[in-house]
Regions:
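Left-handed beta-helix
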Residues: 140, 149-318
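Unchanged
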Residues: 1-195, 306
């Protein structure tokens, strides 16, 4: 329920995506499960099929929320319409250390057709064709195949169905060459955030000609006291900085007291770091309070995660 509220909060009226007119609107199916499984119940496909049938669209794009990309889908649609397959899949060439065992890697021939796929199991190659699980599919064909899947005793999630369809239909493979972060773990999430401190990666993701729409907060600028010391960090608005901050991503309405130190960390909104407290290699969720003199310290390969709303009164060191 919390995730659904967050989605509504960010979409708002849908105006930025052309979804607030008389002739267009958005449909949001309410399906949520705490259980991680490759199979689903009948409600899962009832929601998807209702959306597809109401859409009246010729083509459908399915997106995966585990990859961070800023992709121009118009280019993908153009190639899909030019090559005329029933399925087009987007892939990225990635080094093996950035791929996890839940990712699908593709076998692609010289004409950019998908010949096969398998879950990543490691190997000797340095670079693999990792599927982003972004697909463009002809809608009538997709409805037909999903109705077949929904009728099975144990229907699979959409991504698994689409992976197999890409092979069965010799899908066209579109290579994405821009910035991509494959967020498959806490460490990968941590790295993706701190990547934004590198200007080259930042401008690859937030390209000036390809806007990223999100919720806007009009607040006062962040205040930096004379006692503050800031190096290579990004701040949102509304914060008060009296301490030391370096190599960190800082959200809105954060309060760093004098004598506090934050480095190599991701700080969510409304966090308070008291006098003399130290935070290193940590992900600190919304509304956390770190008491005076307390140390929260993870490592580069194992950052500490502090739960939303926690009050930290004792050291947490890894």
């Amino acid at each position: 329920n919390e995730n659904i509220s967050s989605v509504f909060d960010h979409i708002r009226s849908g105006r930025e995506w052309g979804l607030s007119t008389l002739l267009s609107h958005y449909y949001l199916g309410i399906y949520n499960t705490p259980v991680e499984s490759s199979t689903v119940d009948e409600e899962y496909y009832r929601q998807i099929l209702t959306y597809l049938k109401r859409s009246g669209s010729d083509q459908t794009v399915a997106l995966n929320s585990d990859v961070l990309v800023n992709i121009d889908l118009n280019q993908v649609f153009h190639l899909h319409n030019t090559t005329k397959p029933k399925v087009t899949v987007v892939y990225k060439k990635l080094p093996k250390e950035l791929i996890s065992d839940v990712n699908s890697v593709l076998e692609i021939d010289d004409s950019d057709k998908v010949l096969g796929h398998e879950l990543f199991q490691g190997g000797d190659k340095e670079v693999y064709n990792m599927s982003t699980d972004i697909f463009v599919v002809d809608t009538p064909f997709l409805i037909e195949k999903l109705e077949e899947e929904a009728a099975k005793e144990e229907p699979r999630k959409l991504r698994y169905v689409l992976r197999d369809l890409a092979v069965a239909e010799n899908a066209f493979a579109y290579e994405y060459t821009g910035y991509l972060s494959n967020i498959h773990s806490v460490k990968a999430y941590f790295d993706a955030n701190l990547d934004m401190l590198e200007s080259q990666k930042f401008y690859k993701l937030f390209a000036p000609n390809q806007k990223v729409y999100t919720k806007v907060k009009n607040e006062e600028p962040t205040y930096y006291a004379d006692s503050s010391e800031v190096k290579l960090s990004q701040f949102a608005s509304g914060s008060i900085v009296r301490g030391k901050v370096e190599n960190s991503m800082i959200s809105r309405n954060v309060d760093f007291s004098e004598g506090s130190s934050v480095s190599h960390s991701i700080i969510f909104p409304r966090v308070k770091v008291a006098k003399g407290a130290t935070v290193e290699y940590a992900i600190v969720d919304k509304g956390v309070e770190i008491a005076e003199g307390v140390t929260v310290r993870g490592t580069e390969n194992n950052p500490v995660v502090i739960k939303k709303g926690s009050v930290v009164t004792e050291d947490i060191v890894r």
